[in-house]
Design a protein with these regions (language model features):
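A short acidic/small-residue loop/turn micro-motif
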Residues: 42, 46-49
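Gly/Ser-rich catalytic serine loop of serine hydrolases
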Residues: 24-32
Length: 236
């Protein structure tokens, strides 16, 4: 949050964020939630449980079956016909074209993970209304995961009368892309006149959030988070 808010300030934006959904993509699909600078623990210490949300492709299963290391391995095997136990690292190298294998199947394995994660995160962020930061062992394949994730989050839904609108009541931006971040920072800021006065105030009607990938890795982020959490509770 401090990093994104710093970039917004340097870009001349008055927009600031206080809420965050932190996600890990790896052995499983984990998450943590920060609301107004405070870690959401939940009344049963179960806050941020995204792993057990419904799976878009397989509604009878949890989403983690499509957002995890085992999911990438399964989808690659299904699409390529390769019965060998390929690791996510090997599948990524196949996608990059530096290891023999079915490149289309490798890319599709990460894209499907992105789509399924995007569906779950769209549901979660509807309630949280904040930024999303992604880490974990699979985040190294972000170039294949993120486009599908953003496409899913920015997809449309509708009503029985035929009305169509964004599934989220806000636009989702890629904060690691300079052009996308510029649009995110710019928003739709305008000045409005305060009724009964000659004074104008800034107002930005553009609802928007962003997705970024962790630059320091999941382990360091978790350690730093635990440290700050402990410091904040020393005086309580």
């Amino acid at each position: 949050l401090p990093e994104i808010n710093r970039r917004l300030r340097e870009a001349g934006s008055t927009k600031r964020y206080k809420n965050l959904l932190g996600v890990t993509l790896g052995t499983g699909f984990g998450a943590g939630v920060v609301i107004d600078g405070e870690l959401l623990r939940g009344d049963n210490a179960a806050g941020g449980y995204v792993w057990c949300l419904r799976n878009k492709k397989y509604p009878e299963y949890i989403v983690e079956e499509s957002v995890s290391i085992r999911a990438v391995m399964r989808v690659y095997a299904e699409r390529s016909g390769d019965a060998g136990a390929r690791t996510p690292k090997e599948i990524f190298e196949i996608a990059e074209g530096i290891r023999p294998g079915n490149r289309e199947a490798a890319i599709a394995a990460f894209e499907e993970l992105g789509e399924m994660a995007g569906d779950a995160l769209a549901s979660a962020i509807t309630l949280i209304d904040g930024l999303i930061v992604i880490g974990g062992g699979l985040s190294g394949a972000s170039k294949y995961i993120l486009p599908a994730l953003l496409k899913e989050m920015n997809a449309q839904t509708g009503m029985m009368d035929g009305a169509r609108f964004g599934r989220l009541q806000k636009e989702v931006y890629d904060l690691d892309d300079e052009k996308s971040f510029a649009g995110f920072a710019r928003g739709e800021a305008v000045e409005v006149l305060v009724p009964g006065t000659n004074r104008k105030v800034g107002y930005d009607p553009c609802k928007r959030i962003g997705v970024t990938f962790s630059k320091q890795g999941a382990n360091r982020s978790i350690a730093m988070g635990a440290y700050v959490f402990a410091l904040n509770h020393l005086s309580k």
